């Protein structure tokens, strides 16, 4: 069982700084520029969970080619999270290939689950965008096109080994 938390983390990032997330996965490395100016609460949450090691060993449990790869659920079922929820932030960017956004179960239900866009897709602005890939699109391609079973679950899920955060 993963660590659970009673409440969202206090704001600890500096929205004026640049943050980079390096996701080491069993399929390769993805690097993303986080966007604290667009979504400070969401970036703060992702940075907190990454630094806690929350994502280590977590799989991409839902993959849809031409759409997205989704992970961040410690149970691997699509229904797990960190033990708390936090509010949505306004979405001003589009859901283009390589964007990172929060998965949710409705308004203001963000937790730990996120997705990476495999392709441009016209989603409603209900999923807070908090980052964009700067490298590793071939890793997204490999994950998104892997064979799946029921509920878009990969037959051989890719795991996140670690998420390292750097700031400048």
Model-derived segments and their meaning:
Residues 1-168:
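Cyclophilin-like peptidyl-prolyl cis-trans isomerases
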């Amino acid at each position: 069982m993963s660590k659970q938390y009673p409440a969202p983390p206090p704001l600890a990032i500096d929205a004026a700084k640049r943050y980079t997330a390096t996701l080491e996965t069993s399929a390769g490395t993805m690097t993303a520029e986080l966007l604290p100016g667009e979504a400070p609460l969401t970036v703060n949450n992702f940075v907190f969970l990454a630094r806690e090691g929350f994502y280590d060993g977590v799989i991409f449990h839902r993959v849809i080619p031409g759409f997205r790869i989704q992970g961040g659920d410690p149970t691997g079922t699509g229904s797990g999270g960190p033990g708390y929820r936090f509010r949505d932030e306004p979405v001003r960017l589009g859901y283009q290939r390589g964007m990172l956004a929060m998965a949710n179960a409705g308004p203001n239900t963000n937790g730990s689950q996120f997705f990476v866009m495999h392709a441009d897709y016209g989603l409603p602005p209900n999923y807070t965008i908090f980052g964009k890939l700067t490298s590793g699109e071939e890793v997204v391609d490999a994950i998104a096109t892997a064979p799946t079973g029921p509920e878009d679950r990969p037959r051989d899920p890719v795991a996140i080994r670690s998420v390292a955060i750097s700031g400048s």
